[in-house]
């Protein structure tokens, strides 16, 4: 969800006035700077407002899907004179996206806040505060499916959803892949599904998994599939570089220290330890970066995203644990192809994979979250599926802006040669790359190989070796604990203070150095001889500098000057 869309997505022939929206809503839209509706908005809004149709919409990232369902919801509430009650429920897959949608709805209500109340259930409210807010019967509730069901089961008598007129599920495919289908089935018993319930199902991809939700919640829906991928095709450039396990860190050091990428970068890693190892490695060279992962408190995660969008941070190391959700599906597809190739060959039954991560289930950064003006997505660790790759690179080249995606790929022959820098999922990098290239070529995209000039990079290797040796497993564990303690303090104890003093929130930074066990301050400066000639600065000639100081010259220079006026030997008296 982005607050603005590219001109390639705009429908110049349609104006906001043509939708007969409430004047207060039109004023808020104008304040947001929306000149014209996008293609998805000009198609969905009339169907929702005039024909009262259920809508299943597929549109690419940055095309304005969030506004396409939020504007009809707000407009209907502004013109609704019925009794107070919960009228609309918006479900999203992650807490980050829940907060993002909440902020956008608040902007649409700038000139009508007294009439409509909005509640974000995914915020870190205490049970007592949440119950008091629910008693007021907010018109719009925004939540993840699991959180909503949890609250409904605890407060079934106090929450009445019989007045709900609209149900929206955003990023449907991700909601289903997160395992929320059971929660959505439970929700059916609380909602007036058989009455006049309008449903919006929004996603960047539409597949067969939607059939169950379609049968449960939709009645003769309008299905919108807008092929807008070609709009971004010329704006996104994709590269991959084959490298060794340690050279990933070496290349990251060279790229960020020499500022080879102009603009903001998101570096994706596949687990939390990996993120802290990269941060500890880079900070020894004075490269400031912040970490985003599922262990951090929700308030800290939201603040990091906000500050990144405000250009406070230029390098964000994001842990993408959700990419493992699609690994099994890719393996199954690959297994089907292998079966066809082998013909009558025997196939062993595949063991079911168990989920290994124990972090916040409602965390997600590779999909839906509005990272603004990202120049580059660096897949420091290649994702484990082609679907996860598409979600990651969708963080750049958004809303018609240019972007680049660079992926480090480990050849199978290099796997396991550097144990400290090794990653288990990298063993399948070449296999996954093949799937990614195949998938992207189907969509008309090309992934080009990128060759680094290793002769120029080689001079930095000894410095990278020194820095990497300092990042031990103990240092990673200590940094992880230290970061978590700091963020818990910032998130809980200072929350009320920052609400009363918002100007002091700017001083709260998430990119402070965590410091490994051994600090090497000399690594922060790059000697001129290591830099390529084009990057070297002209050094002024200060003349000959002797190795030793000329003490004789210094002695003669002081000769001839008078002694002190008072000589203690001569002035001494018996």
UniProtKB/Swiss-Prot annotation:
ATP binds at residues 59-66. SUPFAM superfamilies: P-loop containing nucleoside triphosphate hydrolases (SSF52540). InterPro entries: DEAD/DEAH_box_helicase_dom, DEAD_box_RNA_helicase, Helicase_ATP-bd, Helicase_C-like, P-loop_NTPase, RNA_helicase_DEAD_Q_motif. A motif (DEAD box) lies at residues 170-173. Disulfide bonds: none annotated. Residues 235-455 form the Helicase C-terminal domain. Keywords: ATP-binding, Helicase, Hydrolase, Nucleotide-binding, Nucleus, Ribosome biogenesis, RNA-binding, rRNA processing. It catalyses: ATP + H2O = ADP + phosphate + H(+). Residues 549-564 have a biased composition (Basic residues). SMART domains: DEXDc, HELICc. GO terms for molecular function: ATP binding; ATP hydrolysis activity; DNA helicase activity; DNA/RNA helicase activity; RNA binding; RNA helicase activity. The Q motif is unique to and characteristic of the DEAD box family of RNA helicases and controls ATP binding and hydrolysis. Belongs to the DEAD box helicase family. DDX56/DBP9 subfamily. This is ATP-dependent RNA helicase DBP9. The gene is DBP9.
